[in-house]
UniProtKB/Swiss-Prot annotation:
This is Indole-3-glycerol phosphate synthase. InterPro entries: Aldolase_TIM (IPR013785), Indole-3-glycerol_P_synth (IPR045186), Indole-3-glycerol_P_synth_dom (IPR013798), Indole-3-GlycerolPSynthase_CS (IPR001468), RibuloseP-bd_barrel (IPR011060). GO terms for biological process: L-tryptophan biosynthetic process. It comes from Delftia acidovorans (strain DSM 14801 / SPH-1). It is an enzyme of class 4 (lyase). The gene is trpC.
């Protein structure tokens, strides 16, 4: 685990402890289990791909540790609606990803709630899961999918959190950065496997990471390439290789109209 990732995960452990003092585990679980049906995250991606389009998970992200503030004019509901509309001709996001980490990414649970309420798209809670409590918390706030980062968790933790998520009708996106993590991720049941092109130690980005690891991903899994997709050439390289699902944030967040930027990149 890289130094920054360890630092983030250590903070998450503290945040979970504080959250459980405000709302005990049993109460959070009860709240999560009482929520209405989720939106079909995997189905939304597959529907776009079946229609010959890219399945885009469009990210709502204000800032990051490596780049600082990415978008000053930050209104999550408007951004979400822009992604859902796209170019108005069918090229639009399949799903949303919303950063809820406050300390490192200037995210918020409220941003997720606002984004989800403003459109019909399924929503991924983008945060750093270190405890089962957070899975229940994610459903309680309205998330349709959770992110499990292999570098943050051991096999038993991933399996437990996946089981809880699936019991709540949530999808799971498991994120890997190298071959060893991919091997571990493939032991899970989820069809969603994300390959992050960002090296968590150097923060360098190379889309070759996805292309190199793709050959080890079974055909029945839905491979999502994450980070570093910023040009039509990047998209073409991935789609030519048979990769049709993308998680993109920064390239859209820097545009005046994020949805139009999405449509232009994936037209």
């Amino acid at each position: 685990m890289s130094d920054i990732l360890k630092q983030i995960c250590d903070v998450k452990v503290q945040e979970v402890a504080a959250a459980q003092k405000r709302m005990p585990f049993a109460d959070m679980r009860r709240d999560a289990e009482s929520r209405v049906l989720t939106r079909d995250f995997v189905g939304a991606l597959r529907a776009k791909i079946a229609a010959g389009q890219a399945g885009v998970i469009a990210e709502i992200k204000k800032a990051s540790p490596s780049k600082g503030v990415i978008r000053e004019d930050f209104i999550p509901a408007d951004i979400a609606q822009s992604y859902a509309d796209g170019d108005g001709k069918g090229v639009s996001a399949a799903c949303l990803s919303v950063l809820t980490d406050k300390q490192f990414f200037q995210g918020s649970v409220d941003y997720l709630k606002q984004a989800r309420a403003s459109c019909h798209l399924p929503v991924l809670r983008k945060d750093f899961m270190v405890d089962p409590y957070q899975i229940y918390e994610s459903r309680a706030m309205g998330a349709d999918c959770v992110l499990l980062i292999a570098a943050c968790l051991d096999d038993a933790q991933m399996a437990e959190m996946e089981q809880i998520a699936h019991s709540l009708d949530m999808a799971v996106l498991v994120e890997v950065h190298d071959g060893a993590e991919l091997d571990r991720a493939l032991r899970l049941k989820t069809p969603l496997v994300g390959i992050n092109n960002r090296n968590l130690r150097s923060f360098e980005v190379s889309i070759q990471t996805t292309l190199d690891l793709q050959k080890n991903v079974p055909a029945d899994r839905l491979l999502v390439t994450e980070s570093g997709i910023g040009s039509r050439e990047d998209v073409k390289a991935m789609r030519d290789a048979g990769i049709h699902s993308f998680l993109v944030g920064e390239a859209f967040m820097r545009a005046k109209e994020p949805g139009e930027a999405l449509a232009k990149l994936f037209a």
